[in-house]
């Protein structure tokens, strides 16, 4: 039995005796990683703004970075992340004419709301 398990492991097939842990990480580009983790109501407002005025919600979210919002770019300075968000807003505004920016803006707002749900789960409950 042990020899059979060893043979299977050598072929790349995992057996029931050996544990395999698979970790999946999403690779994000710099613009996508610059989306800040915001409180849920702020993220919903940014989604609403991005839906009706492309890039406006992304522009507002850039200022939350200056207020201390965390991003997936911890090694970059706050001002660099701010300018990445401003660049994303500018791209959304310029390309909204051909509908690409509008769609990108809506998806950007949806990503903000998804990240805000993670922000809410990671926040520490306040004690009175």
Curated annotation (Swiss-Prot):
It is a multi-pass membrane protein. InterPro entries: SPEC3/Stum. The chain crosses the membrane at residues 40-60, 88-108. It is found in: Membrane. Keywords: Membrane, Transmembrane, Transmembrane helix. Its main location: membrane. It holds the Pfam family Spec3. GO terms for cellular component: membrane. Belongs to the SPEC3 family. Stum subfamily. This is Protein stum homolog. It comes from Danio rerio (Zebrafish). The lineage of its organism: Eukaryota, Metazoa, Chordata, Craniata, Vertebrata.
């Amino acid at each position: 039995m042990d020899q059979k398990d060893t043979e299977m492991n050598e072929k790349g097939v995992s057996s029931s005796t050996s544990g395999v842990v698979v970790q999946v990480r999403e690779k994000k580009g710099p613009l996508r990683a610059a989306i800040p983790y915001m409180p849920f109501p702020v993220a919903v407002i940014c989604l609403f703004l991005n839906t009706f005025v492309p890039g406006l919600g992304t522009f507002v979210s850039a200022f939350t970075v200056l207020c201390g919002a965390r991003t997936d770019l911890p090694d970059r300075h706050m001002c660099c992340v701010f300018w990445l968000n401003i660049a994303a807003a500018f791209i959304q505004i310029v390309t909204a004419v051909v509908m690409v920016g509008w769609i990108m803006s809506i998806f950007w707002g949806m990503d903000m709301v998804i990240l805000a749900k993670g922000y809410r789960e990671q926040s520490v409950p306040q004690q009175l």
